[in-house]
């Protein structure tokens, strides 16, 4: 399970290191292979263990092709999906297309969300969490939870 927010640095070549605490989990779950793709609602990236992506991909492919929103989601999620492998130092090289999509510079935030991560530019991450609207409604599913 991935959780927490981690400040990480991307070098000039576009390489970034996955935090050490997740490397063994990723090695066990997917032999260090991850799939990175575009987020459909925010200018950030989604990072999945390859095994998790393999379960999600058929669901994305099954979306109705005549639904404009579904087609856009397919284009973003599948069109940007890139399989990457952690090197011996736990680093991956993010392709320029993904870096450009998420407007990345040197400082990034890797945010654990259970079975996946979100990868944000540090500036966009802090702007998004500062932009919490008190009028935002909780999803119905959360109303039954006791935290």
Swiss-Prot record:
It is found in: Cytoplasm, Nucleoid. It comes from the Bacteria. Gene3D superfamilies: Transcriptional regulator MraZ domain. Coiled coil: none annotated. GO terms for biological process: negative regulation of DNA-templated transcription initiation. Keywords: Cytoplasm, DNA-binding, Repeat, Transcription, Transcription regulation. InterPro entries: MraZ (IPR003444), MraZ_C (IPR035644), MraZ_dom (IPR020603), MraZ_N (IPR035642), MraZ_sf (IPR038619), SpoVT-AbrB_dom (IPR007159), SpoVT-AbrB_sf (IPR037914). The keyword Cell membrane does not apply. Transmembrane segments: none annotated. The keyword DNA-binding applies. Its main location: cytoplasm. Residues 5-52, 81-124 form the SpoVT-AbrB domain. Pfam families: MraZ. One of its GO terms (molecular function) is DNA-binding transcription factor activity. GO terms for cellular component: cytoplasm; nucleoid. PROSITE patterns: SPOVT_ABRB (PS51740). Belongs to the MraZ family. Forms oligomers. PANTHER family: TRANSCRIPTIONAL REGULATOR MRAZ. This is Transcriptional regulator MraZ. It comes from Saccharophagus degradans (strain 2-40 / ATCC 43961 / DSM 17024). The lineage of its organism: Bacteria, Pseudomonadati, Pseudomonadota, Gammaproteobacteria, Cellvibrionales. The gene is mraZ.
């Amino acid at each position: 399970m991935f959780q927490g927010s981690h400040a990480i640095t991307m070098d000039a070549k576009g390489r970034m290191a996955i935090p050490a605490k997740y490397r063994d989990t990723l090695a066990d779950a997917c032999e260090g292979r991850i799939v990175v793709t575009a987020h459909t609602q925010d200018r950030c990236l989604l990072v999945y263990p390859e095994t998790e992506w393999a379960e999600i991909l058929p669901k994305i492919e099954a979306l109705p092709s005549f639904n404009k929103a579904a087609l856009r989601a397919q284009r973003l999620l599948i069109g940007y999906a890139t399989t990457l492998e952690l090197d011996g130092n736990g680093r991956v090289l993010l392709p320029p297309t993904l870096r450009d999509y998420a407007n990345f510079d040197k400082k990034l935030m890797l945010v654990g969300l259970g079975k996946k991560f979100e990868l944000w530019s540090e500036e966009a991450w802090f702007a998004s969490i500062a932009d919490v609207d008190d009028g935002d409604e909780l999803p119905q599913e959360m109303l039954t939870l006791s935290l």
